[in-house]
Amino acid sequence: MEVSNLSGATPGIAFPPGPESCSDSPSSGRSMGSTPGGLILSGREPPFSAFTVLVVTLLVLLIAATFLWNLLVLVTILRVRAFHRVPHNLVASTAVSDVLVAALVMPLSLVSELSAGRRWQLGRSLCHVWISFDVLCCTASIWNVAAIALDRYWTITRHLQYTLRTRRRASALMIAITWALSALIALAPLLFGWGEAYDARLQRCQVSQEPSYAVFSTCGAFYVPLAVVLFVYWKIYKAAKFRFGRRRRAVVPLPATTQAKEAPQESETVFTARCRATVAFQTSGDSWREQKEKRAAMMVGILIGVFVLCWIPFFLTELVSPLCACSLPPIWKSIFLWLGYSNSFFNPLIYTAFNKNYNNAFKSLFTKQR
């Protein structure tokens, strides 16, 4: 297969033309999780340029950090009894999906990036397994973020009705729906003959390019959960704004008055001065709950913001590319894909940074190991 250099001044990094261009094929857009065009070694250039080594090193570090950090969170939740409850089961579900992304999806994606001509040489069966896990794990990771956002929303806005028993049932149901829906999206091509992932002639492994499946997979894996998390955070913002206004109205001013009374048995007048004051009806429990709600709202906001920044470039490309006669450089497709993968690295950093119990549990875990 003919390859072309990224630029004349950058040896060792090349990209194949053809199927990746929108103008070459009406269904050239790559569906969620498919093999990207990206960093591959040119047969006519030195096999290991400095830029290639740098990129590979960074991606290997990203894979290792994503795997180890999520594994640490998962082990902590399993070993610490205090974490055997909501919302830590949702965090555990997210950690499982992100561990699988780092262990099964990202390494083979890196191998595919570095293969000359992006040819898949591991066979049809392994191709189907890889693509299925790619779609399954990335979709589950995205929907788990939506589930965490929903749980925080109900906790903040309905803390009286959202009892511990209700919360357990809701979280278990959300986890079940997350993995069932992710499995349906991932296995639909195999179960219903919805396109083929492996092309033996071209030795190409990618998600089914069937246009109807592309719409189904991208909507189910990203656009629907995106709508959910944006709606949830808007409702959280409105609820926080309403509560702040209600607390301000709860501050009661007392007017300043002066009264004069005759002492019944004394020949003097007693003056009583009532000074102007404000009384806010707020207990220490309300203050603690308010601080907890603020941390939860901030955590959800950052989690959603990072989720959108990581995934929206990739999925916007997947939506626009099949509809226009344009050609996005393969290097950008790779950048957008790995930016999406990096969301699995940021997830545990965010939800542990806002919970001191995780930091204490990490310290305790390493102390016991010593």
Swiss-Prot record:
Molecular function GO terms recorded: G protein-coupled receptor binding; G protein-coupled serotonin receptor activity; Gi/o-coupled serotonin receptor activity; neurotransmitter receptor activity
Topology relative to the membrane: Multi-pass membrane protein
UniProt tissue specificity: Brain; in the CA1 region of hippocampus, the medial habenula, and raphe nuclei.
Alphabetized SMART domains for the sequence: 7TM_GPCR_Srsx (SM01381)
Location of this chain's protein in the cell: Cell membrane
Biased segments, Low complexity type: 20-36
Xref: InterPro entries: 5HT5B_rcpt (IPR000431), 5HT_rcpt (IPR002231), GPCR_Rhodpsn (IPR000276), GPCR_Rhodpsn_7TM (IPR017452)
Disulfide cross-links: C127-C205
TM segment ranges: 49-75, 89-115, 128-150, 169-189, 212-233, 301-325, 328-352
Region (Disordered): 1-36
Residue ranges, Cytoplasmic side: 76-88, 151-168, 234-300, 353-370
GO cellular component, one term: dendrite
Residues reported to bind serotonin: D134
Keyword set, alphabetical order: Cell membrane, Disulfide bond, G-protein coupled receptor, Glycoprotein, Membrane, Receptor, Transducer, Transmembrane, Transmembrane helix
GO BP, sorted A to Z: adenylate cyclase-inhibiting serotonin receptor signaling pathway; chemical synaptic transmission; G protein-coupled receptor signaling pathway, coupled to cyclic nucleotide second messenger
The protein's role, per its UniProt record: G-protein coupled receptor for 5-hydroxytryptamine (serotonin), a biogenic hormone that functions as a neurotransmitter, a hormone and a mitogen. Also functions as a receptor for ergot alkaloid derivatives and other psychoactive substances. Ligand binding causes a conformation change that triggers signaling via guanine nucleotide-binding proteins (G proteins) and modulates the activity of downstream effectors.
Family according to the record: Belongs to the G-protein coupled receptor 1 family.
Name of the protein described by the UniProt record: 5-hydroxytryptamine receptor 5B
Record organism: Rattus norvegicus (Rat)
